[in-house]
Amino acid sequence: FGSAAFNDVGQVLPFDIQKRIERFTTGGTMTYSPLTNFTNRLTVGYDFSQQEARNLRPFGFNQRPEGALQNNLWQNRLLTFDYVGSFTYDILETVRTNFSWGGQAVGDEIRELEGWGEDFPGAAQPTVSSASVKIAEEERQRVWNAGFFFQNVLDISDKYFLTTGVRVDGNSAFGDGFGLQVYPKASLSWVLSDESFWPDNFGQMKLRSAYGQSGRAPGAFDAVRTWDPVGWGGVPAFVPENVGNPNLGPEVTSEFEIGFDGSWANDRINAVFTYFNQRTSDALMEVTQSPSTGFTETQLENVGEVSNNGIEIGLNLALIESFDYGLDFGINYSTNNSEVVSLGGAAPFAALNGWIEEGQPVP
């Protein structure tokens, strides 16, 4: 409207916008310990969320006299199963081992329904189905991720700790020809301040190092060939959309880190230092397909390799401690040097709000 006159503004007041949000979460944990050093824990959880957005221009609306209604319904269901078992055993008086195992399964389902209707027969309570012109859209997505792990922690004199483990994951988004992904890990820590040569008044110090792998799965339909249903003039048809990749798997990040945790002056001074070096292989990147295949969209492929390294430093000081008040000061500093090592033969492309090119940093 060209002016702020009350009569003009009042013509849009019947515009009715509503949003309704619902959330329901529940879960339970069962623990079984047949022995003091043998425990089992099973946790089940369920999370349901729903959002409905309703946009109504009623019958008699100034800009659309016969009215229009848009209704969008979004639902998400998340179901989780988590089991962990552990067994602790004293090998020697000063040597203890803790062996644990378990598995996890997560099901994530998303549904979205959208209806549009226009031109109602009268001023009755409007619904999408009561309109003379109706359009509907529906999207569904379900992803299951499941895995199991084994881990052992070796404790020697409460000073030396060696942790080794492995996790095996499967995901419904992986290609049919990929299979399972294995992620190993190992870490070592040394409580240096517990040694006899460490001065009693020189605080606490722990040295640590670790190596491990983690992964990021592709999207729900990235590995399968898909077709986009379209229609023109009432004639149904399909057009090519995603070419698919039966060997598509997760991108895998391997990381090595080393550092220390220190505490002095009765825990009033705390410092943390970490150096890390990451290398991501089989990075998920969009690769342009040959137009002769009939698929004009890009296809997600495991082709890239990216490296990251840097340091993380943290310092926390308890400047004032009293019964009535306290004053703490903290500062953190970090660096990250990244490089696109390889694009797997793909040409440079725009992504992540920047330009991806071999030999250059990641935006």
Locate each region found by the language model.
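Extracellular/periplasmic, surface-exposed regions of secreted and cell-surface proteins
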Residues: 1-57, 68-362
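Flexible, solvent-exposed loop segments that connect beta-strands
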Residues: 62-65
